[in-house]
């Protein structure tokens, strides 16, 4: 794929971005001193950006952005834009509809060929077809709640059976570990069948992980780039026609009347994002929407149309972990056309997925007051603010379709993986590192 257009070529991270340059010049003109992004890092960096020690990592991240999905997202060829290739028929059984399905009832399986150009998939929900499935998907949240509802012979048995108590959790979780020896005793799963552990929560919100038996699962499916089946919450792809107007709501700058918006569904005063909000709101007005905390109900026009009226959106994750970049960035901010202010993994991690100039990171500022001053500066300087939208000329946003896309991607992975045996020895050690 051709590299991104020249305007998206990113500067060294030991140099200030043009937006920060303009801000610094404006402050100097007013004859006032103001801390700018990277203020505390000048001596190490020789400028206003990040330390030289991370420059090589930044270069990798920027190259990944220029080549869009084909380096970091090697497992994610474009979905609706590539021609399907004939593949062997693969059956994938979804053991539980995640969170018991939307509205409390399971949906019909998607057509992978029609939706994602992935052919040769037989998506199953009937557990009677367990023996015919090449892969079985287990959603972690449902897995820990349904201890009795596992596939045979690992499912429910009499707890009084002292010869072998079949459970998948250890004593810390109130049950007994299902060991490799026990697996041999009761029988094995169908030859070549893969058990796939699926999870899209952060390690901080993944209970019961330490209790899972070792070597029980063959593959992982998550937002982590080192998963066996990697499916992020979203990604960017190159526009076929750079002159084409961005789809969706887009920036629509003339309609933006508010400054900062935040939609939050889980309010916890102990979370870093809530603490940072309290600090930020002392210096700049933040309109909070949601049913918890100080939030007010989202207007009837809907979340995206509401956020589209604001210049900035707080894409604050509930916890900070590697690759944990959720719909708060991809959907709530990018799709609505607001500039995201992110709190999550570090900047280098974000730059593996999106251009440097597409977002503002809280870590670029010594404190919330400095960030607030920068947002107010951008509010007064429209030309500088518009620079945060330049990436849209070359890239468009793909939003992952939960849970259909994960289902179809698992099928695709089975088709292309061959028959190499593999098992995950310790999920907790991998996911929580």
UniProtKB/Swiss-Prot annotation:
- Gene Ontology BP annotations: glycosphingolipid biosynthetic process; inflammatory response; Lewis x epitope biosynthetic process; lymphocyte migration into lymph node; oligosaccharide metabolic process; positive regulation of leukocyte tethering or rolling; positive regulation of neutrophil migration; protein N-linked glycosylation
Q: Which family does it belong to?
A: Belongs to the glycosyltransferase 10 family.
Task: List the keywords (alphabetical).
Answer: Glycoprotein, Glycosyltransferase, Golgi apparatus, Inflammatory response, Membrane, Signal-anchor, Transferase, Transmembrane, Transmembrane helix
Its biological function? Answer: Catalyzes alpha(1->3) linkage of fucosyl moiety transferred from GDP-beta-L-fucose to N-acetyl glucosamine (GlcNAc) within type 2 lactosamine (LacNAc, Gal-beta(1->4)GlcNAc) glycan attached to N- or O-linked glycoproteins. Robustly fucosylates nonsialylated distal LacNAc unit of the polylactosamine chain to form Lewis X antigen (CD15), a glycan determinant known to mediate important cellular functions in development and immunity.
User: What is this enzyme's class at the first EC digit?
Assistant: transferase
Q: What is this protein called?
A: Alpha-(1,3)-fucosyltransferase 4
The organism is: Mus musculus (Mouse)
Q: Do the record's keywords include Ligase? A: no
Q: Does the keyword Glycosyltransferase apply?
A: yes
- In terms of superkingdom, the source organism counts as Eukaryota
Q: Specify the glycosylation sites in chain numbering.
A: 117, 218
């Amino acid at each position: 794929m051709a590299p991104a257009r020249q305007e998206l070529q990113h500067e060294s991270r030991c140099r200030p971005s043009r937006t920060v340059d303009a801000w610094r010049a404006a402050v100097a003109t007013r004859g006032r001193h103001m801390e700018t992004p990277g203020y505390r890092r000048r001596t190490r960096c020789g400028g206003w950006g990040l330390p030289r020690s991370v420059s090589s990592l930044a270069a990798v991240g920027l190259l990944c952005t220029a080549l869009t999905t084909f380096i970091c997202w090697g497992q994610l060829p474009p979905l609706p834009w590539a021609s399907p290739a004939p593949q062997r028929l693969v059956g994938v059984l979804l053991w539980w509809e995640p969170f018991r399905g939307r509205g409390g009832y399971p949906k019909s399986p998607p057509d992978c060929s029609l939706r994602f150009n992935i052919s040769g998939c037989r998506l199953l929900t009937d557990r009677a077809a367990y023996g015919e499935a090449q892969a079985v998907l287990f959603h972690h949240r449902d897995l820990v709640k349904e201890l009795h509802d596992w596939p045979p012979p690992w499912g429910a048995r009499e707890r009084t059976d002292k010869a072998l108590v079949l459970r998948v959790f250890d004593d810390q979780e109130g049950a007994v570990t299902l060991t490799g020896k026990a697996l041999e005793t009761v029988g094995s799963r169908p030859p070549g069948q893969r058990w796939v552990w699926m999870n899209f929560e952060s390690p901080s919100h993944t209970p019961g992980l330490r209790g899972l038996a070792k070597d029980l699962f063959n593959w992982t499916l998550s937002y982590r780039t080192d998963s066996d089946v990697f499916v992020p919450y979203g990604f960017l792809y190159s526009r076929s026609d750079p002159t084409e107007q961005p789809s969706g709501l887009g920036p629509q700058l003339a309609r933006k009347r508010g400054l900062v918006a935040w939609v939050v569904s889980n309010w916890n005063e102990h979370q870093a994002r809530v603490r940072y909000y309290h600090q930020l709101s002392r210096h700049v007005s933040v309109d909070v929407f949601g049913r918890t905390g100080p939030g007010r109900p989202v207007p009837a026009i809907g979340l995206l149309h509401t956020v589209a009226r604001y210049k900035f959106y707080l894409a604050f994750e509930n916890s900070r972990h590697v690759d944990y970049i959720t719909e708060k960035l991809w959907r709530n901010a990018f799709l609505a056309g607001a500039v995201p202010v992110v709190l999550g993994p570090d900047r280098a991690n974000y730059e593996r997925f999106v251009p440097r100039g597409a977002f503002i990171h809280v870590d670029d500022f010594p404190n919330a007051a400095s960030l607030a001053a920068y947002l107010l500066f951008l509010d007064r300087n429209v030309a500088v603010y518009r620079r945060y939208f330049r990436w849209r000329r070359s890239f468009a946003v793909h939003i992952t379709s939960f849970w259909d896309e994960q289902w179809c991607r698992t099928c695709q992975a089975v088709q292309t993986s061959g028959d190499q045996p593999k098992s995950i020895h310790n999920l907790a050690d991998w996911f929580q590192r």
